Regions:
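An alpha-helical repeat/solenoid feature that recognizes helix-turn-helix modules
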Residues: 2-104, 112-157, 164-168
Length: 168
């Protein structure tokens, strides 16, 4: 994890260097969540840097076509990371603002009628357009909207404490 995360918080998919499709906000969010679940303290400098970058790039439906920017993959892992990071300095406020933007982004874009009622169009989302389609976009959007019903941060943190010595 350390080798795959730059000092500015940007993360890469593998330690082979930055290549196309292997970096971006989605990877940053995955890095943040993974580091936290592996015991990194929520108030560490890296956690704070990554949280600040995510907070500055909230979910935005119109920007979903950006491969390395604000897409559904990023929104999902960003939602998990910021929810788990609520106990860090400023974390509750970051999560609250993110969650408001997430709902403002997702709910108006859910199909309200017809045979596709309840689903989410792939829209301009890069990964949905690259093959995931309606199933991908609907699954991720539903998982994001129910995130606080499925994950209890204290449970995740209690298991992460066992791994905290790895980061010392």
């Amino acid at each position: 994890m350390r080798e795959a995360t730059r000092k500015d918080g940007e993360a890469i998919y593998a330690d082979q260097g930055v290549r196309e499709f292997h970096r971006g906000m989605g990877m940053l969010a995955v890095s943040n969540l993974s580091r936290r679940l592996l015991g990194e303290a929520g108030d560490s400098a890296m956690q704070q840097r990554q949280h600040e970058r995510m907070a500055a790039t909230p979910p935005n439906w119109k920007a979903a076509s950006e491969l390395e920017g604000s897409n559904m993959y990023y929104w999902y892992y960003g939602s998990l990371a910021l929810m788990v990071g609520r106990d860090a300095q400023g974390g509750e406020d970051r999560w609250r603002k993110w969650n408001i933007e997430l709902k403002k982004t997702l709910l108006p874009n859910q199909n309200k009628s017809g045979p596709r009622r309840g689903s989410f169009d792939p829209g301009g989302d890069y990964w949905a357009q690259a093959g995931g389609g309606r199933l991908y976009s609907t699954a991720l959007c539903v998982l994001m909207l129910e995130i606080y019903y499925r994950y209890e941060p204290e449970y995740l943190r209690s298991h992460a404490r066992e791994l905290a010595p790895l980061w010392e």
